Amino acid sequence: AATPAAVRVSVTAGSANHPVVTATDHPGVRAAAAAMAEVFGVEPYYTREGGSIHPVEMFDRLLGVPTVLVGFGLPDDRIHAPNEKFDLEQFRAGIRVLTRLWDGLASTLPRRAAHGR
């Protein structure tokens, strides 16, 4: 590390998650895309984002349950920074997307027995 002579730097590795990617052709992703297109009037743009939401990896590894993460923030929201904000209309649009998503999932995904996968 480029530090002043009086500064010592040490790095200790902590815990980490295994990476997870849900296929864009998964029924849950397609249902989320349809809900977003209906609410926002345009097809969503897919991105891969890094993050550390530990349950996502566990849902995938332990339960075999794919996870769809959907964001409603805007680039200028300064998420996790000073003066963080979240536009109220984006919040309302997110609610509309999620209600349509739940309807879409209910009609798209296969029903499973209460005791099985």
Model-identified regions with their sequence ranges:
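An extended, acidic, His-containing surface patch that forms the Zn2+-binding/catalytic region
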Residues: 2-117
